[in-house]
């Protein structure tokens, strides 16, 4: 099983600009994501996220499942078709439940379009990725601004990543973002997001 450990913070364009200048060395990635669910919303109900994301034109299909604390299950495969990706995700070790739920049919429900600026941060015994995301959430024929910071553990102890993220949050007065991009985009689809 893949495991993802990350911390997210809401931000403003001004804060992103300051961090970009102070840290330097960022590389841009153009991201366009489509999130999928069953017609009954079963994946969302089970807090599972199924997406197809184009990262600088490369298609990556991902399943995320609930986990403990700030971690969660994550499986990714290179594929440009979500239906073809499901058996590949199963081969990669994702829960068989995906196959059962998706057998009833899946549909696109919401999405995102944003630019991600990434930079590696060397930490004691490991490495984190600092990501600055700016763009839009899409859903229900509406758009809402997206501006956030992610700190993801890439290797080494999660505690080192958490400590770096906490220092970053304190330095720039960042507020933790409890909801995923998917959750905010699906709320927008349902008319529950006020931007």
Where are each of the predicted segments found?
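Phosphate-end processing signature that detects enzymes handling 5′-triphosphorylated RNA
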Residues: 1-195
């Amino acid at each position: 099983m893949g495991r993802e450990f990350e911390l997210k913070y809401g931000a403003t364009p001004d804060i992103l600009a300051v961090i970009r200048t102070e840290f330097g060395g960022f590389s841009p990635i153009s991201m366009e994501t489509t999130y999928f669910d069953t017609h009954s919303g079963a994946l969302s109900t089970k807090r599972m996220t199924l997406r197809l994301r184009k990262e600088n034109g490369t298609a990556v299909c991902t399943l995320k499942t609930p986990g403990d604390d700030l971690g969660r299950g994550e499986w990714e495969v290179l594929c440009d078709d979500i239906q073809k990706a499901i058996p590949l995700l199963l081969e990669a070790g994702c829960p068989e439940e995906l196959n059962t739920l998706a057998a009833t049919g899946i549909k696109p429900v919401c999405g995102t379009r944003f630019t991600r600026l990434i930079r590696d941060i060397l930490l004691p015994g490991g490495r984190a990725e600092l990501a600055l995301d700016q763009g839009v959430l899409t859903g229900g024929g509406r758009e809402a601004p997206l501006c956030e910071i992610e700190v993801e553990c890439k290797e080494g102890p999660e505690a080192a990543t958490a400590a770096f993220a906490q220092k970053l949050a304190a330095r720039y007065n960042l507020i933790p973002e409890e909801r995923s991009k998917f959750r905010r985009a699906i709320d927008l689809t349902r008319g529950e997001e006020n931007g």
